[in-house]
């Protein structure tokens, strides 16, 4: 038995015996966070936050710094891996009703928002063509805020256009926000262990629990090993798989790319933004696409916690997953028919899922009562 308090805390943590592989993604996210902070530090040592030198400093890291290419690729592809894990983690929470642990869910969505902000600031730092124009388009959405919009945008940019002060403050924010993520992650874990994690059946797990270590810790190691193996294979053989070709050119404010788009993990929100022709409406839809996740614990009306035994909710859940993938795909395409209509239909379906949660719950309750 371990003698150290922290080791004892995790080693003797009582966990339900029947939690499946879908519960492994929390530990995978923790590993991703550690990897991002570590590689990010080594990159920050060699990076220069200046619009004339930023792009050159990335080239210097890749070419001249020992293993700089590996650090840079691990950091860039590690971010994609981070978002893959977090989207699966949220999907598991939606499917198995983990959101009913309200405090944990709220802290988790706050974590998601902080992570998205951090990733956005990081995407701007290489000062490539797509980095610059994605930053211009997204930050310009602040001008849609009534009365305060222009002042807010000028304050964020540090001037009347994206320039050196913008890059400096984005670098500062990208450096400091991971520490906020670490703090929020600690809070998230504390709140989770206060009530205990759910399980696939949605039953009270108190009657059948086992220590986290060695049973679940060894199970977690399998997916962790597979994730790290996948990451290293991509870094070694397909390092540019997630990169945009435009980002291999230095930012040029005088030349607009044919098709401006952010990283793939923001495309679902960008697709929703783009599907609404009004600027303020699009900005509100973009914010609501994330903020609507806060409402789920309060709209759950079903007697059963997970969707395991709720066929209508299962159908809606998998419709949401396919909708999410379709919006992401449509957002990579030009703004022209039929992609405009596809984006509008899928955006409507995305929000419809959250509106139907209470109605489906009541319907399923009535069905069970009649059996």
Swiss-Prot record:
InterPro entries: Cyt_b/b6_C, Cyt_b/b6_C_sf, Cyt_b/b6_N, Cytb/b6-like_sf, Cytochrome_b, Cytochrome_b_C_euk/bac, Cytochrome_b_N_euk/bac, Di-haem_cyt_TM. It comes from the Eukaryota. One of its GO terms (biological process) is mitochondrial electron transport, ubiquinol to cytochrome c. The chain crosses the membrane at residues 25-45, 69-90, 105-125, 170-190, 218-238, 280-300, 312-332, 339-358. Keywords: Electron transport, Heme, Iron, Membrane, Metal-binding, Mitochondrion, Mitochondrion inner membrane, Respiratory chain, Transmembrane, Transmembrane helix, Transport, Ubiquinone. One of its GO terms (molecular function) is metal ion binding. Its cofactor is heme b. A ubiquinone binds at residue 193. Heme b b566 binds at residues 89, 188. The keyword Electron transport applies. It is found in: Mitochondrion inner membrane. Component of the ubiquinol-cytochrome c reductase complex (complex III or cytochrome b-c1 complex) that is part of the mitochondrial respiratory chain. The b-c1 complex mediates electron transfer from ubiquinol to cytochrome c. Contributes to the generation of a proton gradient across the mitochondrial membrane that is then used for ATP synthesis. The cytochrome bc1 complex contains 3 respiratory subunits (MT-CYB, CYC1 and UQCRFS1), 2 core proteins (UQCRC1 and UQCRC2) and probably 6 low-molecular weight proteins. Heme 1 (or BL or b562) is low-potential and absorbs at about 562 nm, and heme 2 (or BH or b566) is high-potential and absorbs at about 566 nm. Belongs to the cytochrome b family. This is Cytochrome b.
